[in-house]
Amino acid sequence: MILIEHVLGNVKKDPVWQEKLKHATLDLLVLDQREAQKSRCRKSTTHGLDLGISLDRNVVLADGDVLAWDEETNVAVVVQINLRDVMVIDLSELKSRSPDELIKTCFELGHALGNQHWKAVTKNNEVYVPLTVATTMMDSVMRTHGFQHLPFRFVKGGEILPQLSNSEARLLFGGAEDSDTHVHVASPLDEPHGSGLHIHAIHSHGDGDSHNHDHDHSHSHGDHDHDHKH
């Protein structure tokens, strides 16, 4: 196993590395959205190289990160992150609404997202929701609940990731495929451990039974993320 403790650079952001690896063979370390949020993991590259990732706690890997480079063989180990697409809901137009309308719309939107068990992060007057179903289904939910007046679009997860703090990225992309977790709407403040609104919706237990939580509450997590299971 090869221990990786530092990132050498990024082939997608650094012109120096772009030129250096222009004719190199890239051995990809392919990570899914959950793995990408971990600073420590063990995984093999596409060429079978066994890597042990051990980065500083607040460092997470980014798409295009260069982990190793062998000039003699002209081979570089580069990170490839596969993130889900994201629905982006623009809330800017609510600024022109009355306070009552704004509160009502935000509450109803949160309720709708909660009922679908969709994770979400609010930032820069936008709501980011990772896709867990077809875009047609998400489009239908928005229109069925009367949110067609709110502009929304679908973009690649990689376009959203640079705008997020590490904690927000973990919240949005870490385990977005889980169907039995609560929906979390993060604080718009770019803080590593901000509190968030937790919207409790219907939970399936895998045995055919389900139940509904009709209460909302907010609480902080301290310095860790966790799922709620019943």
Curated annotation (Swiss-Prot):
Residues 197-230 are annotated as: Disordered. SUPFAM superfamilies: Urease metallochaperone UreE, N-terminal domain. One of its GO terms (biological process) is protein folding. Its main location: cytoplasm. Residues 204-230 have a biased composition (Basic and acidic residues). Transmembrane segments: none annotated. One of its GO terms (cellular component) is cytoplasm. It is found in: Cytoplasm. One of its GO terms (molecular function) is nickel cation binding. Keywords: Chaperone, Cytoplasm, Nickel, Nickel insertion. Gene3D superfamilies: Urease metallochaperone UreE, N-terminal domain. It comes from the Bacteria. Signal peptide: none annotated. NCBIfam families: PRK13262.1. Involved in urease metallocenter assembly. Binds nickel. Probably functions as a nickel donor during metallocenter assembly. Belongs to the UreE family. This is Urease accessory protein UreE. The gene is ureE.
